[in-house]
Amino acid sequence: MVIANKNIIFVAGLGGIGFDTSREIVKSGPKNLVILDRIENPAAIAELKALNPKVTVTFYPYDVTVSVAETTKLLKTIFDKLKTVDILINGAGILDDYQIERTIAVNFTGTVNTTTAIMSFWDKRKGGPGGIIANICSVTGFNAIYQVPVYSASKAAALSFTNSLAKLAPITGVTAYSINPGITVTPLVHKFNSWLDVEPRVAELLLEHPTQTRLQCAQNFVKAIEANQNGAIWKLDLGTLEAIEWTKHWDSHI
C-alpha cells in the first residue's frame, strides 16, 4: 500500500475534487495528511479528522503564487515536524480565462515552484531520500477546450513539466505522474469565463457533455496513487481510470 502509514502533503486539498480526494486518502490510512490551501475551512478539517481518527490531519495556509523561497520556508516547517514526507500532491487550479496571469501563476507556475521547493528536501544529489509527486493536470492538456485557451495551455504546460520530472527520476530520486480529470461536476465548471468572451455559454455547453462525479474522480485518483507508476499519464474520465500512451512526434535524443 502506497498511502498507508505515509506522510502526504496535499496542495489545494480542500477544493472541489481535492476535498473528495482528501476524504478517500484519509480512508486509506496515511500517518499524516498535511493540507495546504489558500482559505482555511475548519469544518472540512474536522470532517477529515472524524473520518479516520488514526490519521493526523493538519492545515497550513498557502498561496501557490508565492516565491520558491517562501514555499521552501513553509516546507521546512513541515519537514521539521514530520521528519519525512513521502508524497506531494499539487492540486491548485482555477478556470477563468479573464484572469490570464493568475491562471498561469496558479495552474502552472505554482506547480513548478512548489515542486522546485520540495526538491531541496528530496533530491538524492543533496542526500535526500527521494519522493513521489502527483500533479493534477487535465484532459485539456491532451486536447484543448479552445474557448478557454489560457486554461488549456496552462494544463498542457503542467503535463509537460510532469512528464519531464518522471524522466529526471534516475537523477533526482523523485518520481512523478499526472492526474488528468475529464469533465467533473465541481463548482469550477458551473460558471467560468471564456477568453475574450468568445463563447459566453461555454460552461453551459460543457455540462451538456457526459460528466463524472467528484467521488468517482477521487476514488480513481486514489487508485492511481496506489499504482505509483512513474511517468504515468492518468486519464480520469466518465468514472474510469486509464493510463494513456503519449504519441511521440519528436525526440531530442539527449
Curated annotation (Swiss-Prot):
Q: What catalytic activity is recorded?
A: a primary alcohol + NAD(+) = an aldehyde + NADH + H(+); a secondary alcohol + NAD(+) = a ketone + NADH + H(+)
SUPFAM superfamilies given for it?
NAD(P)-binding Rossmann-fold domains (SSF51735)
Q: What is this protein called?
A: Alcohol dehydrogenase 2
Question: PANTHER family recorded for this chain?
Answer: 15-HYDROXYPROSTAGLANDIN DEHYDROGENASE [NAD(+)], ALCOHOL DEHYDROGENASE-RELATED
Q: Which GO terms describe its biological process?
A: alcohol metabolic process
Annotated Gene Ontology MF terms? alcohol dehydrogenase (NAD+) activity
Q: How does it assemble?
A: Homodimer.
Quick one: which residues bind NAD(+)?
Answer: 10-33
The alphabetized UniProt keywords are:
NAD, Oxidoreductase
Instruction: Give residues annotated as binding substrate.
Output: S138
- Active-site positions, per UniProt? Y151
Q: What is its EC number?
A: 1.1.1.1
List the record's Gene Ontology CC terms alphabetically: cytoplasm
